[in-house]
Amino acid sequence: MKKWTKTALLTGCACCIAGAVLMFSGWASGGKAYAETYDLNAMSGSAKKEDGISTQEKIKLDDFDELQADLTIGDLNILPSGDDSCYLAWRIPSKKGETAVEYRVRDGVLSIEETSAVSDTIYINIDFTEENLSGGKQSETGVILYVPEKKVLKKIEVTMGFGDVQMNGIHAESGRLQNADGDITLFGCDMQNIKCKADYGDVELKSGTWENGSITLEDGDAKIQNTKLSGDVSVENSYGDIELELGKKDLERLEITAKTDFGEIDVPDTMENLMQKEEDEQSFSYVPDQPAGRITLMTKDGDISLEND
């Protein structure tokens, strides 16, 4: 081994040991409590996290039948309210803890958007260290909208910047879901005529219904599980996999077209004879006697999986 290589390795090992010692010393002398209380992103060592967080406890809203949400930082969760009313709450980083969200209900439309206290702030997050120092505890930020379980939204328009979208038991007749950097997850939702787009993130539909509409991904995976599909449905992906997992009867009642430019297609044994392969490209087509709907699955670089449970 060359002398300089040995010296570099020894120096690296020494730095790792020194770093571990310093980290343990910081944790033992109260670093855990500090990481839980103070803002690691602030220039001041005395700045507390809550000083830079805009918090709104659950507040009751007027009734509405359309939603427009435009958010940049944090997650958006839409959940059942448990009663006949709608509520809104949030916890979002903002300048000096100023109000981060503006909302209003006008002509049956609920609009939710961030204020300048968020958009005028450059937020560089180093809180990845917080999870290690605080024993796995990490603050969640975002907006939570609560709606009645049986409420049907005529239209839903959601535009996200950096954060995840999660909806539980939501009913919508039309709309658009768009996320620049984050996942979109729908549990037990009944959706019609929805255009869903994720630039960098996954899309998952589970235990609901999806009638007409499209799902488009640039870099992420799409998973549709135990979801009743009808009408014309398309899933297009640039870099990522597509997984369709339905009951045997539900899968066999769909007209299915699948194609991948660079990847593999995995189908149930009873459909293997419908596969077509040509170098890296694979395709699949299935047409039942009386289709309940049509789904098109396309990915440029990724695998496609069809499963019947």
Which residue ranges define each predicted feature?
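Short, hydrophobic/aromatic-rich segments at coil-to-beta transitions
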Residues: 87, 154-156, 230-231
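Alpha-helical transmembrane segments and their membrane-interface anchoring/capping motifs
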Residues: 1-83, 125, 268-273, 307-309
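Short Gly/aromatic-enriched secondary-structure transition segments
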Residues: 83-93
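Detector for the N-terminal beta1/A-loop initiation region of ABC nucleotide-binding domains
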Residues: 72, 199, 238
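Right-handed parallel beta-helix
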Residues: 52-66, 75-83, 96-192, 197, ...
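Short, surface-exposed interaction patches in beta-rich subdomains
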Residues: 187-188, 193-194, 203-309
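Internal hydrophobic scaffold segments of catalytic domains
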Residues: 15-20, 93-110, 248-249, 255-257
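Short, flexible beta-strand-to-coil junctions
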Residues: 71-72, 91-95
